[in-house]
């Protein structure tokens, strides 16, 4: 395990240096190419519910045009929200136990909602913590699971619906979303590096691997033996050309590391599990 972690750490350091030298113009050009390919995928057209990472201003494919297109097509768009989990959440005790930080996929209400997001210290558009309780969770309910002993009134960590404005209620009626949660059809993922076998190296926190595992086991983790988890969404990663390792080089992975179903590269390449 120590050797694996060391190999990952060294590869991350190498890629971070490479990406720091990629120009803004190159990122813009590659983002345009990758976006065009993604928007042409049958899986994208068929997806009613998708999650999209919100991109940093440099070093990765921009997802702004993807979010805009998804809303123009009437899709339901979910984005990552990271929070400190504290005590094990009641609804996902087994799933989140042992992790100090957890990623949920919460809904954007509209394009205007997306455009109103403020950037965090990394320049990533981020959901306002004060709005979390009103946002649908792709696993069901609203917001994030309530920690043991907390109340919806005293914490932003809530799966209880907070009173909405009239305009928000009208919007949700139009979307006709299932309160019970039905997972996602498509997940658009970032990464630090990829190889031609569709292995992915993240930034070291395991957020996406952990989330996909929770998604697949949702229901079982809540103690409902009649549930077998949700259908696995189609996993699509976006990468700058500099993030794809040369042929013959491989991402070091552990058993829990989840490969993607498709990798779209900013130079126009698309790698799939069936190719």
Regions found by a protein language model. Give the residues of each.
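N-terminal active-site beta-alpha-beta segment that forms phosphate/nucleotide-binding
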Residues: 2-175
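Surface-exposed, charge/polar-rich loops and edge strands
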Residues: 1-6, 10, 17-21, 125-199, ...
